[in-house]
């Protein structure tokens, strides 16, 4: 397991082998903030990516079952802690770009968008019609987001065009235009 899993299981939610870091735990929040801050400084990092491809509701629902009189509190504490974490990173690193990503766009909500941009908006990517739908649906509300292209046809490329685009192409292909 990870260092956190082995040394501080109380900083996580869940009882199985897969656990979820709990930003709602003040001690865990302080440690994570200081740890990431020190890595950003020591490695001279100026763009931070916060990925969130986790079914967090499973962990929060499990906590709700343990505390039936406190439904939703685990999620509320986690979200408040997470937003404090993001705010503190921005305070310590003014001007640093923060990229948010989540399976299916779970981090594309207003409070998070005040703090970060989705350079990669969803792991549902590359499929032209689906990405067109994402771009159409998001553009009025979230003008800056990213997608990617992994095929070299004009249709695929244009379908995946967005303000931020990832080119996932094989540079060894000699006849690629």
Predicted regions: what is each one?
Residues 1-15, 63-64, 112-122:
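Aromatic- and acidic-residue-enriched segments that line the glycan-binding/catalytic groove
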Residues 1-42:
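Active-site-adjacent "subsite" loops/lids of carbohydrate-active enzymes
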Residues 3-4, 60, 108, 170:
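Short acidic, gly/pro-rich beta-turn/loop elements at beta-sheet edges
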Residues 6, 14, 48-53, 99-103:
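Generic beta-strand/beta-sheet core signal
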Residues 10-19, 62-78:
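Glycine-rich tight-turn/loop motif centered on a GG-T
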Residues 17, 31-68:
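Active-site groove signature of glycoside hydrolases
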Residues 25-33, 72, 76-83:
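Non-membrane alpha-helical structural segments and their capping/turn regions in soluble enzymes
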Residues 54, 82-177:
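Active-site-proximal substrate-binding groove within the catalytic cores of carbohydrate-active enzymes
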């Amino acid at each position: 397991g990870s260092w956190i899993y082995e040394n501080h299981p109380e900083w996580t939610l869940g009882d199985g082998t897969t656990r979820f870091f709990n930003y709602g735990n003040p001690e865990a929040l302080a440690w994570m903030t200081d740890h990431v801050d020190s890595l950003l400084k020591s490695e001279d990092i100026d763009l931070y990516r916060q990925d969130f491809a986790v079914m967090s509701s499973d962990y929060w629902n499990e906590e709700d079952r343990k505390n039936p009189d406190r439904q939703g509190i685990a999620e509320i504490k986690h979200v408040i802690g997470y937003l404090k974490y993001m705010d503190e990173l921005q305070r310590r690193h003014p001007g640093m770009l923060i990229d948010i990503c989540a399976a299916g766009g779970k981090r594309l909500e207003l409070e998070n968008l005040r703090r970060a941009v989705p350079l990669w908006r969803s792991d549902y990517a590359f499929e032209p019609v689906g990405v067109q739908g994402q771009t159409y649906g998001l553009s009025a509300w979230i003008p800056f987001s990213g997608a990617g292209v992994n095929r070299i046809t004009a249709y695929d490329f244009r379908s995946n065009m967005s303000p931020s685009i990832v080119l996932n192409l094989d540079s060894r292909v000699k006849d690629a235009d």
